[in-house]
Amino acid sequence: MSKPVRMEPGVKLRDGDKMALIPVKFMPDPNEEVLRKPDWMRIKLPPSSQKIEHIKSTLRKNKLHSVCEEASCPNLAECFNHGTATFMIMGAICTRRCPFCDVAHGRPLALDPDEPKKLALTIKEMGLKYVVITSVDRDDLRDGGAQHFADCIKQIREHSPQTRIEILTPDFRGRMEQALEVFRETPPDVFNHNLETAPRMYRVARPGADYKWSLELLRRIKEMHPHVPTKSGVMMGLGETNEEIVQVLKDLREHGVNMLTLGQYLQPSRHHLPVKRYVPPAEFDELKDVAMGLGFSHAACGPFVRSSYHADLQAKGEEVK
């Protein structure tokens, strides 16, 4: 009999330890044959560069986190080489345990009250003109962390008034009203919240989340701040159908969402949900045409597209694949 996993404050649980705590009957079979990556999914990673090392050392120096590293993003080298990073606030331990995600699960530590200012000064030091701020889920906080997002927005605007700010938020489960009150006074320049997958896949892929709740959050933000673009991201390759994805796009548009990212799911480890299929680039192109036909102002669709991948270009309406 396996030893029960202990939840100690500040301890990161990953891979098998994290997956053992997911309260769903279906679990990936570690012995299941892994699909071979097709040619279009093979990229040559650039060697480490001064820019990559500078960004990593800057983050370490200021005790900050990037989702690029914590979620093992395949675009890390490209983005860091371009001098961009997506900052992850409120620590690197998530209270959720989604089996597609590589961010660690556990009991997070208390918020760092100095983080908003440290983040703002780091952004100023790096000379960033467009930043994406995301976070782990913090179901332990009364407002789900909304005020901490707002504090970061205020500090960035104080120290770098020309910098545009996109936030990629959790769903504020059970705390939507508190979060909306916070964002009423401190909206970002772009509000992003990912649906991640089709509703049929939620029980397996997003335990603890609710498809309709996420759509309602996006709708309420748009209703409150009509001038703020709203954005959402979806993965493919978890077992959904293209027809289900098209319905997700329709649902997003019906809830006022302006911008879309659509990319290929990649399995972080053998303990995570397996890739059920690799979607050919031509299908992403077709889905982009569908998205634009539905009225999205911008749709970044391609195998390596992620929520914050070239987010500055997405916000300008430039082509991203």
UniProtKB/Swiss-Prot annotation:
CDD domains (UniProt xref): Radical_SAM
Residues given in the record as [4Fe-4S] cluster 1 binding sites: C68, C73, C79, S308
Cofactor note: Binds 2 [4Fe-4S] clusters per subunit. One cluster is coordinated with 3 cysteines and an exchangeable S-adenosyl-L-methionine.
EC code(s) of this entry: 2.8.1.8
Annotated keywords: 4Fe-4S, Cytoplasm, Iron, Iron-sulfur, Metal-binding, S-adenosyl-L-methionine, Transferase
GO MF annotations, alphabetized: 4 iron, 4 sulfur cluster binding; lipoate synthase activity; metal ion binding
Family matches, as PANTHER family: LIPOYL SYNTHASE, LIPOYL SYNTHASE, MITOCHONDRIAL
Protein name in UniProt: Lipoyl synthase
Cited Pfam families: LIAS_N (PF16881), Radical_SAM (PF04055)
Sequence ranges assigned to domain Radical SAM core in this UniProt record: 80-297
Cofactor(s) needed for function: [4Fe-4S] cluster
Compartment(s) of residence: Cytoplasm
Organism of this sequence: Aeromonas hydrophila subsp. hydrophila (strain ATCC 7966 / DSM 30187 / BCRC 13018 / CCUG 14551 / JCM 1027 / KCTC 2358 / NCIMB 9240 / NCTC 8049)
Assigned GO CC terms: cytoplasm
Gene that specifies this protein: lipA
Reactions listed under catalytic activity: [[Fe-S] cluster scaffold protein carrying a second [4Fe-4S](2+) cluster] + N(6)-octanoyl-L-lysyl-[protein] + 2 oxidized [2Fe-2S]-[ferredoxin] + 2 S-adenosyl-L-methionine + 4 H(+) = [[Fe-S] cluster scaffold protein] + N(6)-[(R)-dihydrolipoyl]-L-lysyl-[protein] + 4 Fe(3+) + 2 hydrogen sulfide + 2 5'-deoxyadenosine + 2 L-methionine + 2 reduced [2Fe-2S]-[ferredoxin]
Stored InterPro entries: Aldolase_TIM, Elp3/MiaA/NifB-like_rSAM, LIAS_N, Lipoyl_synth, rSAM
Similarity comment: family membership: Belongs to the radical SAM superfamily. Lipoyl synthase family.
Gene3D superfamilies: Aldolase class I (3.20.20.70)
Residues the entry annotates as binding [4Fe-4S] cluster 2: C94, C98, C101
Pathway: Protein modification; protein lipoylation via endogenous pathway; protein N(6)-(lipoyl)lysine from octanoyl-[acyl-carrier-protein]: step 2/2
